[in-house]
Amino acid sequence: NKAPLIKFLQKGKGVCNITGEKLYESQMLTAIASLSLNLIFAQVLADVEAFKYVCYFELADEQVSGEMLAEKLDEMLCLANIEYKEKRAANRLKHLEVKLLKPGSYEVIKNNAVGQGQKDGQYKTILLQYKHQYPYNLADFV
């Protein structure tokens, strides 16, 4: 008997859809990894009101431009997701932004979560989520 193999790709969280592109956390992770950054923290928020994704990065030491990173990420996501590429080409989905967080931002966010009862060793966040569901205003850390 040859039973079909099923590969589990994604749970319900970590998927965002602003204009029909259905972007997966795994696609974003691959795109971010291609940048070869020394990341301390990364958070990507889907802003449905502005029709764009905003990436927040805390870097260990690099002096890079958020605009340059946004350009490269956009290219990688267009290669990884045909619907993303089509929505970008039609300008239904606006160009993503990369905002660089101040040093120590991750620690402040993590300590706040721990102060609200989350266990320090178990703290983690979903990389890709909707802005309106994220508990912090990351613009305060830019």
Predicted regions and their residues:
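AMP-binding adenylation
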Residues: 1-142
